Amino acid sequence: MSGLLHTTLSGLNSDSYCEISRYRDQHFRGSKKLQEKFLKISSTLYVGNLSFYTTEEQIQELFSKCGDVKRIVMGLDKIKKTPCGFCFVEYYTRADAEHAMRFINGTRLDDRIVRTDWDAGFKEGRQYGRGKTGGQVRDEYRTDYDVGRGGFGKIIQMQKANQQPAVY
C-alpha cells in the first residue's frame, strides 16, 4: 500500500475522529462528569451546518450508509417550525455512530460541509434552535443577497441563465 493512502486510511481508523469535543450542552441536567459519561456511551450525533433545504430523507440516505438509523430529529425554528440547519441522528449502536463520525463529518451535503459531534441523547425541546430566531446563530445574519457568498446563489444564477434568450 502506498505511503499516502496508508496514512489516510490509518487516520480514518484512528480514534481521533470519535473523540468527544469540548462543547457541552448548557441545558444538561447534571455534572460535567456525568455529561461526559453519557457522551462516551452515546449513539446519538448532533449534525450541524445543514442547509435549511436539506430534508430528513437526505439525512436518512447519507447516514444509513454507516449503519441502521434509529431516528432523525430535524432542528426547527421555534416560531415558524421550519428546518433551521441542524438535526440529531440516533443509531441503534455506538459502533454505527462512530462510523458516521469517521466518514461523514466534513463531507458535503447540499453544498454545505456537514459537521458532526457527539450528543448525550436527544430530549424533547432540543429540536428548537438557539439564537433569537431559533436557527443556528451564524445563519441569522445572512441576507438573501450576499456578495461574499456568491450573490444570490447557484439556483438563482441558473434560473437567470435559463431566462436569457439564446444567441445564434
Swiss-Prot record:
SMART domains found in the cross-reference section: RRM
Localization annotation: Nucleus; Cytoplasm
Positions of mRNA binding: 23, 46, 115-119, 126-130, 136-137
Domain spans labelled RRM: 43-121
InterPro entries, A to Z: NCBP2, NCBP2_RRM, Nucleotide-bd_a/b_plait_sf, RBD_domain_sf, RRM_dom
Keywords, comma-separated and alphabetical: Cytoplasm, mRNA processing, mRNA splicing, mRNA transport, Nonsense-mediated mRNA decay, Nucleus, RNA-binding, RNA-mediated gene silencing, Translation regulation, Transport
Major location category of this protein: nucleus
Any one biological process term the GO annotation gives: regulation of translation
Record-level Gene Ontology MF annotations: mRNA binding; RNA 7-methylguanosine cap binding; RNA cap binding; snRNA binding
One Pfam family, short name: RRM_1
Database matches in PANTHER family: 20 KD NUCLEAR CAP BINDING PROTEIN, NUCLEAR CAP-BINDING PROTEIN SUBUNIT 2
Protein family according to the UniProt entry: Belongs to the RRM NCBP2 family.
Annotated function: Component of the cap-binding complex (CBC), which binds co-transcriptionally to the 5' cap of pre-mRNAs and is involved in various processes such as pre-mRNA splicing, translation regulation, nonsense-mediated mRNA decay, RNA-mediated gene silencing (RNAi) by microRNAs (miRNAs) and mRNA export. The CBC complex is involved in mRNA export from the nucleus, leading to the recruitment of the mRNA export machinery to the 5' end of mRNA and to mRNA export in a 5' to 3' direction through the nuclear pore.
Record's protein name: Nuclear cap-binding protein subunit 2
Species name: Gallus gallus (Chicken)
